[in-house]
């Protein structure tokens, strides 16, 4: 819009005007119309020109006017554009409203059409329904007329015609009934007794209308739902109804025949037999075990549920399925109608520790179950004695329904075991809880005797010929173990009687030298007291001349009553005439005391062997019936004094408790849960088999208190996972919603960490208490070191989050309690589990008094739990006291012995020596041992390597080191590694590492990982700077470098020291090459 200006002030469109001479200026007016003089393309009125003489003064105002004019033009254009824009918007709105009205009209029209179509369809359906009703009514009328016609024909029939003709259905039913009867009769004739198939005699008692005490159908396992011989419904007892023309005599004969058949069944008692025979060979009655009606009630007594088991025999069996578990499962199922996907732990790498494990199909599960049943009997054969009165938890059932729902089998098998018991047999140990016998045996198939596999054909003595044998492995285990235990007891009773007879001969012939008594570790205290009275009376008859009745009997006591000094004083105070008899009696008492002490020691060994097999035995908690002190004869029985607690040996301590075995998923399938009870049971059996357990001191564990748990975990977390279900109901409902239904059918907090409503809280607290007890005994000097065989693990458990099989962090709680109660200033925690201990790191991340060092697979955060990066060094005052030896590089190649030994040599041990701890705690997970699948580890360490790592750590803190079991799921691997660690703790000579490992250099990924860790922590620990050049060396090369360095230092020291100080030193202390004085 702007025009180019000339120097004279005119625009480019204007032509220059010729100046007039001064003579003509005087004759011109002041203003002139120059319209005619302008060019044609310039409008005269558009640009008026001022031709006054004083134009030179108005020329500077021309650009300002032009600018103002341009501004006005711009404003006009803007207003025009604004008006056009408003017009467009109004047009758009008008068209939009028009289109909206059209669309709405079309929508209404469509809805109207749809409604009309629905109305027509509904009307057609109504008409069709009416036609169907009419047709059905017509058919009913026709059928009614047909029946009336038949009835009329029957009324008007002739006398010679038959009154009724059997239909085709009746004939088929009759034929099937006759065939079943013939098959059952032929089967009985072939076997001469009832079939051994449980389905037969369950079905045989189910249909009976005469036997009202048959077990309810709900108690039968799902495996019994197949059609069986001789089984038919109650309505089919008499397939042909009696007609008016049939005589009653025929019906009575049928009833008598049925009663005779039922009397021949071995499941019912025969009342016509003699009483002695019935007591001696009493067949198994279902009503005694599967029903809880009164013992003397008749057939009309109502049955109770199958879960209520009669305690008539003095035993209350353990019911596997508890109401608490049922209620939790019911809450999980009924919450929001269905179970949503699991709200699992979310991490940057892996959400769950078992992600990627192959799923086990039903066929594999069935095969594993058969192998488990095959391997269970050899495991039970090895020195496992089952006491009468105990109840086996059915871990060997063929299906979860048979284990949980089949409550009729458990009392049935228990009653069967009681029937095998002789009348004089009494329960030796009472109060034993459920015994979980794991299916996987530590003993391989090559160690199993061939005769053990024949136990399924074993028929116990005393059983009637018609009584069927149980068909599952659990009942066979009951019977076999029962008989073995009874044979042991009979054998040792005879030996005990011979031993007591020998003692009596010693009393009657004091001049004969005493012989060493035989040892029988299987005897119990009850047997000692049982034979005590029998031995006292003959001894009173043999020594009638003694004056003091208190010395008349030799008592075999549980513990000594008097010390030897007191006995010597009593001898000195006796009269001279009684001194020989008193000395003789003292000799006898000493012999009996020695014998009893030896027997108590053997009883403890027997108790340990039973605990190793998974059977808790406590002799001290049971006291047999004894004579009251107020009775006249009580003076001859001295009072027994409880044994004072003995001080443990200063050696390696072990802690283990069978209650931790009960923490199992309610689905019962251990194949889908790597963290199962067989882990610690196999380790404990391995320690027993190798003899390492006998060299250690076994301590008693306990449950950790809630206050101890809250040293690391929050109060809500402690109450939720550490209390019973009743206390859990008092918590906020949002807290209890963390439990979810697992795909296997059980309950858990995620797909890995299962939850058992009854046993998980107790097992988790017991694991913490066992670790705490062992750590405190080692820290106070009662024990040298220790190994805790505990589960569930704990190093993944955070302050308020359970994960990775862990609920409570046992090692972290023990460290906190050491700080609070014993004022331990420096604690070293080494975690060599293949997974990072995120919970332990969180508990001490800002604590400079606890040095946490973890060796784990990291893979840049792509391995569970995703934490444990090398740059996580701590915070606040704890900076530098959190060392993560994070291996990166995946499994190409996997880490092995050379890499872990190099990490210990260059990172772990130098920092630990510089830290100088007072106590060393080890989160001892063995899932880095070879044999674990990739999701659970994938590394190839050997079990021997962990023995050498343990031996290196024993050089710290004066040897005060405690290992607590964490991860590890391959049974062979964890058993070998545990054996190696316990051997190292005991100070045994370890097997040498292979030469290949000694000369093998760590792989490139491991070297890179160690260099990264050393670079980060070199500013906190000065010892790392000296060892950085030897990271890539093998063990042999590193030892050579250290020897050369030591020789160089020695040579430099000898050159810098003068002769006189050397001579003076030789006089004061020996040199290195001299032998120490």
UniProtKB/Swiss-Prot annotation:
SUPFAM superfamilies: Arginase/deacetylase. It catalyses: N(6)-acetyl-L-lysyl-[histone] + H2O = L-lysyl-[histone] + acetate. A motif (Nuclear export signal) lies at residues 1044-1077. A motif (PxLPxI/L motif) lies at residues 348-353. Residues 205-224, 627-639 have a biased composition (Polar residues). Keywords: Chromatin regulator, Coiled coil, Cytoplasm, Hydrolase, Isopeptide bond, Metal-binding, Nucleus, Phosphoprotein, Repressor, Transcription, Transcription regulation, Ubl conjugation, Zinc. GO terms for biological process: cell population proliferation; cellular response to mechanical stimulus; cellular response to parathyroid hormone stimulus; cellular response to tumor necrosis factor; chromatin remodeling; epigenetic regulation of gene expression; negative regulation of cell population proliferation; negative regulation of DNA-templated transcription. Residues 653-1077 are annotated as: Histone deacetylase. It is found in: Nucleus; Cytoplasm. There is a cross-link at residue 557 (Glycyl lysine isopeptide (Lys-Gly) (interchain with G-Cter in SUMO)). CDD domains: ClassIIa_HDAC4_Gln-rich-N (cd10162), HDAC4 (cd10006). The active site is at 796. Its EC number is 3.5.1.98. Zn(2+) binds at residues 665, 667, 673, 744. The modification Phosphoserine is found at residues 209, 245, 349, 466, 563, 630-631. Residues 132-162, 258-273, 515-530 have a biased composition (Basic and acidic residues). Residues 289-310 have a biased composition (Low complexity). Belongs to the histone deacetylase family. HD type 2 subfamily. Responsible for the deacetylation of lysine residues on the N-terminal part of the core histones (H2A, H2B, H3 and H4). Histone deacetylation gives a tag for epigenetic repression and plays an important role in transcriptional regulation, cell cycle progression and developmental events. Histone deacetylases act via the formation of large multiprotein complexes. Involved in muscle maturation via its interaction with the myocyte enhancer factors such as MEF2A, MEF2C and MEF2D. Deacetylates HSPA1A and HSPA1B at 'Lys-77' leading to their preferential binding to co-chaperone STUB1. This is Histone deacetylase 4. The gene is Hdac4.
């Amino acid at each position: 819009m702007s025009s180019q200006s000339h120097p004279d002030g005119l625009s480019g469109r204007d032509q220059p005007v010729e100046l007039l001479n001064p003579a003509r200026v005087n004759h011109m007016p002041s203003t002139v119309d120059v319209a005619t003089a302008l060019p044609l393309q310039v409008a005269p009125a558009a640009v008026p020109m001022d031709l006054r003489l004083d134009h030179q003064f108005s020329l500077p105002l021309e650009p300002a006017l032009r600018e103002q004019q341009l501004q006005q033009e711009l404003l006009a254009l803007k207003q025009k554009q604004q008006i056009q824009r408003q017009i467009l918007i109004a047009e758009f709105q008008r068209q939009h409203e028009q289109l909206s009205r059209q669309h709405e009209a079309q929508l209404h029209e469509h809805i109207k059409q749809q409604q009309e179509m629905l109305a027509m369809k509904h009307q057609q359906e109504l008409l069709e329904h009416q036609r169907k009703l009419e047709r059905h009514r017509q058919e009913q009328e026709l059928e009614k007329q047909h029946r009336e016609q038949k009835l009329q024909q029957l009324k008007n029939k002739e006398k010679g015609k038959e009154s009724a003709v059997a239909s085709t259905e009746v004939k088929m039913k009759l034929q099937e009934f006759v065939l079943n009867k013939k098959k059952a009769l032929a089967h009985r004739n072939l076997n001469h007794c009832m079939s051994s198939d449980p389905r037969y005699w369950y079905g045989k008692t189910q249909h009976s209308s005469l036997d009202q005490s048959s077990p309810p159908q709900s108690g039968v396992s799902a495996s019994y739902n197949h059609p069986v011989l001789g089984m038919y419904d109650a309505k089919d007892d008499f397939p042909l109804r009696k007609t008016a023309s049939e005589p009653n005599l025929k019906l009575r004969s049928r009833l008598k025949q049925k009663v005779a058949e039922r009397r021949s069944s071995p499941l019912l008692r025969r009342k016509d037999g003699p009483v002695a025979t019935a007591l001696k060979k009493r067949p198994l009655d279902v009503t005694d075990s599967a029903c809880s009606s009164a013992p003397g009630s008749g057939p009309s007594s109502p049955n109770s549920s199958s879960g209520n088991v009669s305690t008539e025999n003095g035993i209350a069996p353990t019911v596997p399925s508890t109401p608490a578990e049922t209620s939790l499962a019911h809450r999980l199922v009924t919450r929001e109608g269905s179970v949503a996907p699991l709200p699992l732990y979310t991490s940057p790498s892996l959400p769950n520790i078992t992600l990627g494990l192959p799923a086990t199909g039903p066929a594999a599960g069935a095969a594993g179950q058969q192998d488990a049943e095959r391997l269970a009997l050899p495991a039970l054969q090895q020195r496992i004695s089952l006491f009468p009165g105990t109840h086996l938890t059915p871990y060997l059932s063929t299906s979860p329904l048979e284990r949980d729902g089949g409550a009729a089998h458990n009392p049935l098998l228990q009653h069967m075991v009681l029937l095998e018991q002789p009348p004089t047999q009494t329960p030796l140990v009472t109060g034993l809880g459920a015994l979980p016998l794991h299916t996987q045996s530590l003993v391989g198939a090559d160690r199993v005797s061939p005769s053990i596999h024949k136990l399924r054909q074993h028929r116990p003595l005393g059983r009637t010929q018609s009584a069927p044998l149980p068909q599952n492995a659990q009942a066979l285990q009951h019977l076999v173990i029962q008989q073995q235990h009874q044979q042991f007891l009979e054998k040792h009773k005879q030996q005990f009687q011979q031993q007591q007879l020998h003692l009596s001969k010693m009393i009657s012939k004091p001049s004969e030298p005493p012989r060493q008594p035989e040892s029988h570790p299987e005897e119990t205290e009850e047997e000692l007291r049982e034979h005590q009275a029998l031995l006292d009376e003959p001894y009173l008859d043999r020594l009638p001349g003694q004056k003091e009745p208190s010395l008349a009997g030799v008592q075999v006591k549980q513990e000594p009553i008097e010390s030897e000094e007191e006995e010597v004083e009593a001898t000195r105070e006796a009269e001279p005439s009684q001194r020989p008899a008193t000395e003789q009696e003292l000799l006898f008492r000493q012999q009996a005391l020695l014998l009893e002490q030896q027997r108590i020691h053997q009883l403890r060994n027997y108790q340990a062997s039973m605990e190793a097999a998974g059977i808790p035995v406590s002799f001290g908690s049971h006291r047999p019936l004894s004579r009251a002190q107020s009775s006249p004869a009580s003076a001859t029985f001295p009072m027994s004094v409880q044994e004072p607690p003995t001080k443990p040996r200063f050696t390696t301590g072990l802690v283990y408790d069978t209650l931790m075995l009960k923490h199992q998923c309610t689905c019962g399938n251990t194949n889908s849960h790597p963290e199962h009870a067989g882990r610690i049971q196999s380790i404990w059996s391995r320690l027993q088999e190798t003899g390492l357990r006998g060299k250690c001191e076994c301590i008693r564990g306990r449950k950790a208190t809630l206050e101890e748990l809250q040293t690391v975990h929050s109060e809500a977390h402690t109450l939720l996972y550490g209390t019973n279900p009743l206390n859990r109901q008092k918590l906020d409902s949002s807290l209890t919603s963390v439990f979810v239904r697992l795909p296997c059918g059980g309950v858990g907090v995620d797909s890995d960490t299962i939850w058992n409503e009854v046993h998980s809280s107790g097992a988790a607290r017991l694991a913490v208490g066992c670790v705490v007890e062992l750590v405190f005994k080692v820290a106070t000097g009662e024990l040298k070191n220790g190994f805790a065989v505990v589960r569930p693990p704990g190093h993944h458990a955070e302050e308020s989050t359970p994960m990775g099989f862990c609920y409570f962090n046992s090692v972290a709680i023990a460290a906190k309690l050491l700080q609070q109660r014993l004022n331990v200033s420096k604690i070293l925690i080494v975690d060599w589990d293949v997974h990072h201990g995120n919970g332990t790191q969180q508990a001490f991340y800002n604590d400079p008094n606890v040095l946490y060092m973890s060796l784990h697979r990291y893979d840049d955060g792509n391995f569970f739990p995703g934490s444990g990066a090398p740059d996580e060094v701590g915070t606040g005052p704890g900076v530098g006291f959190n060392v993560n030896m994070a291996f990166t590089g995946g499994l190409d190649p996997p880490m092995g012995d050379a890499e872990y030994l190099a990490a210990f040599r260059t990172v772990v041990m130098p920092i630990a020596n510089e830290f100088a701890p007072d106590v060393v705690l080890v989160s001892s997970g063995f899932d880095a041992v070879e044999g674990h699948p990739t999701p659970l580890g994938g590394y190839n360490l050997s079990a021997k390597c962990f023995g050498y790592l343990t031996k290196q750590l024993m050089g710290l803190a004066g040897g005060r080191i405690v290992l607590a079991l964490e991860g590890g799921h391959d049974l062979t691997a964890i058993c070998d590694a545990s054996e190696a660690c316990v051997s190292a703790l005991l100070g045994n000579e370890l097997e040498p590492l292979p030469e290949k490992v000694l000369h093998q250099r760590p792989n490139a990924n491991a070297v890179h990982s160690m260099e990264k860790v050393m670079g980060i922590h070199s500013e906190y620990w000065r010892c790392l700077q000296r060892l950085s050049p030897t990271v890539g060396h093998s063990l042999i090369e590193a030892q050579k470098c250290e020897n050369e360095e030591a020789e160089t230092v020695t040579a430099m020291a000898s050159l810098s020291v003068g002769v006189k100080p050397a001579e003076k030193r030789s006089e004061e202390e020996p040199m290195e090459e001299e032998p120490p004085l």
